Regions:
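Extracellular/periplasmic, surface-exposed regions of secreted and cell-surface proteins
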Residues: 2-3, 29-34, 38, 55, ...
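Generic structural signal for well-ordered, non-transmembrane alpha-helical segments
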Residues: 164, 346-349
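Short, small/polar-rich motifs associated with maturation and membrane association
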Residues: 1-284, 288-298, 310-312, 359, ...
Length: 664
């Protein structure tokens, strides 16, 4: 447990950590095929819950020790190579480029990140070049996935028999042959309506035999059928197993193949180190209309410019394409994709007509033909991302010996992400999942971009006195900036369907819609941390951070967030030295206060939207369309920090030469 772990603005021996921390190593990431960094944490970090919707390229929701906020965001902070990044940036990182991940869980560990760390912190360290010969590595994998339904679905015959029996049990069955199947009654009453939807008639009739005059072939009912089941003496010949069952889920699924390839280079000397990689991911979904592709380029370099100055820079470039086909977030109770649509369709609803063509009726059980809608719906999102992390570190002890143990470090990081979301729904799209519009040939083209940068200046002081006192001091100042802007266009009755969302101008412009958005926010912070160790047994960590956020009200922008933690290395005490099988035993307790400012940047001042002022002051309609404005968000001059105070008590242990380790 003496391995070094990242703790936020520095590193520590794992045995000296006073807060709640879980580490996920490179070895753990390689143990199973993962497409993003968050999947590597799943099931490997206690107290971390990851909920995914299984769409390729989706990150899912991460919760560290549950939710902390009622209305604001509960997402953790992601820090990549010391630079805070947005949650979406995790999709742009190739998991094979990750050296380690540390999850900070309690307030005493996360308080060093102030308001940004209120929901926990995920620290990611990417690979760096290593001293030695140039090494070139290739990693490639291919995996398969399918959807294995745990539900034993009824076939068509079982469903109609069940419907009929439920009516018999309710004394509501009205067949001419007692309780026996009746082709003149059942087709309309229990089979979706063969009179109203003629395409169902051949499917339903397959369970019966008919004479040349169209009447059903009859047979003698058995004594059991007459006395127990309530059949008439003569009943139609009937076999429900002959009713075809449409394999809707088979139509929309497949055995998905995922390819993952990476080529990396590592090189280094005592003065410089270099790591670079090229990676390609091609992930199919078991649903035929979904897939994901990602291309990444990663470059990390460090140079020991002089004995006292080290500089480094990392650049990550990414491009990804997500195709989602039929997808909806309309409500929490409806189907969300083509597979959900398929499970909602009746098993007796045919996908093809008698000529083998796709059915596209205007109503009835086959109206939302899954095969037809897959062909009519396209949803594609393209991302272009760039992340920069850089640092310069000055060791004053190498300049003047009395200053040994004092270092200055400046970090600068930036992130740019551009997204284009294109959606197109053709003329035969049947709106199966509750979309807002049922207009024909609808196209959406949404563009958004995000820019963020972070600047941090830090001073580190590490001193040891009389061999038993170890003192560490960290002082930091940081500034952060975030900017987002977007534009969206909606077009109806597009003239060129093959142009998808690239020709929205050729549409019914009287129905077109356009919107745009912009927001920016700033944060500033000052932080101090003290680490003290007595005889390498008794540990104290004190942290204080002064945070300011532009999103909050004028008088509430700044606040102070403290934390404290104590730890006792019981295994270092003399009374345990004779017990050889106990290698690590540490008891820790921590308390901290964190803040959350994840609110709309303009909520304190309110927001205005334009609106036709046709009915001002309840005076009735005005003949001219006069443009007015109304408040969409009421101003809140008292909006301040949402604070969470928490206490954590834990124990870390390692037994039998640390073959058995754990935390509680």
């Amino acid at each position: 447990l003496d391995e070094v772990v990242v703790v936020g603005y520095g590193v520590q021996k794992k045995s000296d950590v006073t807060g709640a921390l879980t580490q996920v190593t490179e070895k753990t990431i390689k143990e199973r095929p993962v497409q993003n960094a968050l999947q590597a944490m799943q099931g490997k970090a206690a107290g971390v819950q990851i909920t995914s919707n299984n769409r390729p390229g989706e990150l899912g929701d991460v919760r560290i020790r549950g939710n902390r906020s009622i209305n604001a965001s509960n997402d953790p902070l992601y820090v990549i190579d010391g630079i805070p990044m947005t949650a979406g940036s995790m999709a742009d990182v190739n998991p094979n480029d990750i050296e380690s991940m540390e999850i900070l869980k309690d307030a005493s560990a996360t308080a060093i990140y102030g308001s940004r760390g209120a929901n926990g912190v995920v620290l990611i360290s990417t690979k760096k070049g290593k001293t030695g010969k140039v090494t070139i590595n290739y990693d490639g994998s291919m995996s398969f996935s399918t959807i294995d339904s745990m539900t034993d679905w009824m076939n068509s015959g079982e469903l109609i028999d069940w419907n009929r029996q439920s009516n018999i049990n309710a004394n509501a069955y009205t067949g001419k042959y007692g309780n026996a199947p009746d082709p003149d009654i059942d087709g309309d009453a229990y089979f979706g309506g063969v009179t109203k939807y003629p395409y169902l008639r051949p499917v339903f009739n397959s369970a019966f035999q008919f004479n040349s005059d169209g009447t059903p072939v009859l047979r003698d009912a058995t004594e059991y059928e007459q006395k127990v089941l309530g059949y008439a003496a003569r009943v139609p010949v009937y076999d429900s197993s002959k009713i075809p069952t449409t394999p809707w889920t088979d139509y929309v699924t497949r055995t998905a193949i995922t390819h993952n390839h990476q080529l990396s280079l590592s090189a280094g000397t005592e003065k410089s180190k270099l790591y670079m990689s090229l990676a390609y991911l091609d992930q199919q979904s078991p649903m035929k209309d979904q897939d994901y592709k990602r291309y990444t380029v990663n470059l990390n370099g460090e140079i020991q410019a002089t004995d006292f100055l080290k500089v480094g820079m990392g650049v990550n470039l990414s491009h990804s394409i997500k195709n989602y086909g039929i997808v909806s977030n309309f409500s929490n109770t409806t189907a969300k994709d083509s597979y959900g649509l398929a499970t909602n369709l009746m098993p007796y609803a045919p996908a093809y007509d008698e000529n083998g063509s796709l059915l596209s009726p205007s109503d009835g059980p086959s109206q939302h033909n899954a095969l037809l809608n897959i062909d009519q719906a396209q949803n594609e999102t393209r991302y272009y991302g760039a992340m920069l992390s850089s640092f310069a570190e000055l060791d004053f002890g190498k300049i003047w010996t009395p200053l040994e143990g004092i270092r200055w470090r400046t970090n600068f990081g930036a992130q740019y992400r551009n997204a284009r979301e294109g959606s197109y729904y053709g003329n035969d799209f049947t709106n199966p999942l509750g979309y807002a519009s049922t207009e024909p040939n609808v196209a959406y083209n949404n563009q958004s971009q995000k820019l963020a940068w972070t600047l941090e200046n830090m001073i580190f002081v590490n001193k040891t006195f009389n061999r038993i006192h170890s003192l560490g001091l960290t002082l930091m100042q940081s500034a952060e900036y975030y900017r987002t802007e977007g534009i969206e266009v909606r077009a109806y009755e597009c003239k060129f369907p093959t142009a998808l969302w690239y020709s929205v101008g050729d549409s019914n412009t009287s129905k077109a819609g356009i919107g745009s958005s912009f927001s920016e926010q700033q944060r500033a912070s000052y932080m101090g941390r003290i680490n003290y160790s007595l005889m390498d047994r008794y540990l104290i960590t004190l942290t204080g951070r002064w945070d300011g956020a532009s999103m909050l009200a004028v008088d509430n922008k700044w606040d102070f967030f403290p934390s404290a933690a104590l730890a006792w290395k019981v295994n270092e005490e003399n009374f345990l030295q004779a017990i050889g099988w106990i290698n690590t035993l540490k008891v820790r307790v921590g308390y901290g206060v964190t803040g959350n400012a994840s609110v709309s940047p303009y909520q304190t001042g309110g927001a205005m939207v334009s609106q036709w002022a046709n009915k001002p002051f309840g005076q009735g309609a005005v003949t001219t369309n006069t443009t007015g404005a109304k408040a969409s968000v009421l101003p809140n001059k008292m909006l301040g920090w949402e604070k969470t105070a928490s206490t954590n008590v834990g124990i870390d242990f390692g037994f039998l030469n640390n073959r058995i380790t754990g935390s509680a």
